[in-house]
Design a protein with these regions (language model features):
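N-terminal intrinsically disordered, cationic/polar leader segments
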Residues: 2-147, 151-179
Length: 179
C-alpha cells in the first residue's frame, strides 16, 4: 500500500489542472505551465479542487509508480504556484561568478573561465560574486542546472574550496602532519 500515493493533492487557488485522455497532465499556475505524460497504469482524476491517483492493479510496478506519480504531480503544482529555488555558494580566494545576459561566467581557479549557457525556463541570479541562485518552475530542471554548476568545481575536503549548496555541510579532513 502506497501511503504517499493514497493522499489527495489539493489544488490551490489560481492553479488549473487538466488531464487528457492519454494520461497527460497539464498544470497552469501564476508562474507558468508544466506538462507531463504519466503511465497508463495509474489513473489520474481531478475532482473539484483535488487530484487523486488510483492504481489499476496491485502489481509491484504499479505500486511503485503510484507514489511517484502523486509526488510528481504535487511538485508540478508547487512549481507553478510557488516555484523552486536552489542557492549555491562559491568558496575560495579569487573564485567568483558573474551574469552576462543568458551566460553565467565562472572563475574557479582554472587557467580559463567557464561560460555556462542558461537554458530556457530557468532563472539564474547572482546577488553577489560568491552566491548563485537558480530558480524555476520545474523542480527536476532546477536541481539539474544547480548540480551542473556545482560540478564545475566540487568542494574539496581539505580547505572546503569549490561550489557548494548553501545548506550543504562539507566534511573536512585533516591534512598530513609533519613527522
Amino acid at each position: 500500500m502506497s501511503r504517499i500515493g493514497n493522499k489527495t493533492i489539493t489544488i490551490p487557488a489560481g492553479c488549473e489542472v487538466t488531464v487528457s485522455d492519454k494520461n497527460e497532465v497539464t498544470v497552469k499556475g501564476p508562474k507558468g505551465t508544466l506538462t507531463r505524460q504519466f503511465s497508463p497504469l495509474i489513473e489520474i482524476k481531478v475532482e473539484g479542487a483535488e487530484v487523486k491517483c488510483v492504481r489499476a492493479n496491485e502489481a509491484k510496478q504499479t505500486k511503485q509508480l503510484h507514489g511517484t506519480t502523486r509526488a510528481l504531480i504535487n511538485n508540478m503544482i508547487v512549481g507553478t504556484t510557488e516555484g523552486f529555488k536552489k542557492q549555491l555558494d562559491i568558496v575560495g580566494i579569487g573564485y567568483r561568478a558573474a551574469l552576462q545576459g543568458k551566460v553565467l561566467n565562472l572563475v574557479l581557479g582554472y587557467s580559463h573561465e567557464i561560460n555556462y549557457e542558461i537554458e530556457e525556463g530557468i532563472t539564474v541570479e547572482v546577488p553577489n560574486n560568491t552566491t548563485i541562485v537558480v530558480s524555476g518552475v520545474d523542480k527536476q530542471r532546477v536541481g539539474e542546472v544547480a548540480a551542473q554548476i556545482r560540478g564545475f568545481r566540487k568542494p574539496e575536503p581539505y580547505k572546503g574550496k569549490g561550489i557548494k549548496y548553501s545548506d550543504e555541510v562539507i566534511n573536512r579532513k585533516e591534512g598530513k602532519t609533519a613527522a
